[in-house]
UniProtKB/Swiss-Prot annotation:
Organism: Deinococcus geothermalis (strain DSM 11300 / CIP 105573 / AG-3a)
Family stated for the protein in its record: Belongs to the FKBP-type PPIase family. Tig subfamily.
GO cellular component, one term: cytoplasm
Gene Ontology molecular function: peptidyl-prolyl cis-trans isomerase activity; protein folding chaperone; ribosome binding
Function: Involved in protein export. Acts as a chaperone by maintaining the newly synthesized protein in an open conformation. Functions as a peptidyl-prolyl cis-trans isomerase.
UniProt signal peptide: none
Pfam families registered for this protein in UniProt: Trigger_C, Trigger_N
Name of the gene encoding the protein in the UniProt record: tig
Name of this chain's protein: Trigger factor
Residue span(s) of domain PPIase FKBP-type: 160-231
One of the GO BP terms on file: protein transport
Domain free text: Consists of 3 domains; the N-terminus binds the ribosome, the middle domain has PPIase activity, while the C-terminus has intrinsic chaperone activity on its own.
Length: 449
């Protein structure tokens, strides 16, 4: 039985009383497990008396196991009974005695109450970039550049040439330099030189990785000069790119640019809407919620570093030496708060809209996500695990609510709208989900959903 003691804002405390019969049942379950798992010389498995088992594992061990079992069952059950969604809790158990009732007190912070502003009155200003003839021609020029060839010439080096140089000295070697993207000090030193010339290049002081490099001079010899040859924009160029004609290339390229522009416009409108949704939200966020997200984000960073062979302690010391650790931790806390606010706003939006995800929608999107990552649906499910699947379900629900709200603002018919497709929905939800265990998932666990 659960009894609410106090509730002030997000702060709450309640007391839970567990009947003696439940306590005895928990003791019986723990003793049965010990009898099965603990081997006692002279006794067959499961036949050792409790006193003998207690002498092997200790009375304190048995009590801890029983207490943990009771708390795991009756704490979430009490939270559901009182309709509380706890973000953070401190449990204060009273003494545990076999054959007697067991009580404990819970003090913590509840999942916050969220109130959204009138999001239907939001005016979105973001638009898709216009694909003009100038944009199309610039993209065609980029295609020419990417498909350029180089021809060896006998003349002084010019600004757009590719130059092969040999670094003189014991550790020298030959390598190409593309002058149109080279550093200014390299470009200035080489322009006007000829094959066979020896050139001194002064390299400014700079930092590379963890190391500071002072200003120094490198001596090189010019081995060859090649000039860039651009193919003319004609049908032959188009056919080299597997298009039947230049007109077809221009038509298909414009269509692709317009598709990307629509995606860019949609992404900008999404971000603008979510930002305004968060700005109009009224909520008192428990610090524990932000702290938990910050810790999860830090663990993700540590995992990423580990995959690159870098220990977090080494990276932390490096940032401390550079005087950047405090800034890093401050930015991490700000990002954690921002993510929590987005999650709360989108979860409340889904609740207000009554958004539900059908089994077919979830299955289709999971299949699309698996395919996009080169996995079978079964492999993806094993990789995510139960918590990950539940968190992803919540992310998809948020995404569906976001799409529905945007469609409403656009004056579009929401029912049956399938423009985004399962794969795009999966990608968008994955970007919004942030961490494997989202705030909404943990609230759902407390609510018993």
């Amino acid at each position: 039985m659960a009894e609410l003691i106090s509730k002030e804002g997000n702060k709450v405390s309640f007391r839970v009383a567990v009947p003696a019969a439940e306590v005895n049942r928990a003791y019986d379950q723990v003793w049965a497990g010990l009898a099965r798992d603990v081997r006692v010389p002279g006794f067959r498995p499961g036949k050792a008396p409790r006193k003998v088992l207690e002498s092997r594992v200790g009375k304190g061990y048995v009590e801890n196991e029983v207490r943990d079992r009771l708390l795991q069952v009756h704490y979430p059950q009490a939270a559901r009974e009182l309709k509380l969604s706890l973000v953070d809790a401190r449990i204060e158990p009273e003494p545990l005695v076999s054959g007697q009732p067991f009580s404990f007190t819970v003090r913590g912070e509840t999942y916050p109450e969220v109130t959204l502003g009138d999001w239907r009155a939001v005016q979105l200003t973001a638009t898709a970039p216009e694909i003009t003839d100038e944009v199309l021609n610039r993209t065609l020029s980029d295609l020419q550049e990417r498909n350029a060839t180089f021809q060896t010439v006998e003349r002084p080096i010019e600004a757009t040439d590719q130059v092969t140089i040999e670094e003189l000295g014991e550790e020298g070697g030959s390598y190409p330099v593309y002058l149109d993207v080279a550093e200014p000090h390299v470009r200035d030193a080489l322009i006007g030189k000829n094959v066979g010339d020896e050139v001194e290049i002064t390299v400014p002081a700079h930092q590379h990785g963890d190391h500071e490099h002072p200003e120094h001079t490198v001596r090189v010899r010019v081995q060859s000069v090649q000039t860039k040859q651009l193919q003319p924009l004609d049908d032959e160029f188009a056919r080299s790119l597997n298009f039947e004609s230049l007109d077809r290339l221009r038509t298909d390229l414009r269509a692709e640019l317009e598709r990307r522009a629509r995606q860019e416009g949609d992404a900008a409108r999404r971000e603008e809407f979510v930002n305004q949704l968060v700005e109009g939200m009224q909520v008192e966020i428990p610090q524990a919620l932000i702290d938990r997200r910050r810790e999860a984000m830090l663990e993700e960073i540590q995992d990423d570093l580990g995959r690159q062979g870098v220990k977090w302690s080494e990276y932390e010391n490096f940032m401390r030496e550079q005087g950047k650790l405090d800034e890093f931790l401050s930015d991490l806390a700000k990002n954690a708060e921002s993510r929590v606010k987005r999650d709360l706003a989108l979860e409340k939006l889904a609740e207000d809209l009554g958004v539900q995800l059908s089994d077919a929608e979830f299955s289709n999107t999971m299949n699309a996500l698996a395919q996009a990552n080169g996995l079978t649906p079964q492999q993806l499910q094993r990789q995510l695990g139960p918590n990950g699947i539940n968190a992803y379900y919540i992310s998809l629900t948020r995404e569906k609510a976001l799409q529905q709200a945007l469609a409403t603002l656009n004056g579009q018919q929401v029912a049956g709208r399938q423009e985004a497709g399962a794969e795009q929905t999966a990608q968008a939800a994955e970007q919004e989900s942030g961490q494997p265990q989202a705030e909404g998932e943990q609230a759902a666990e407390q609510r018993g959903e």
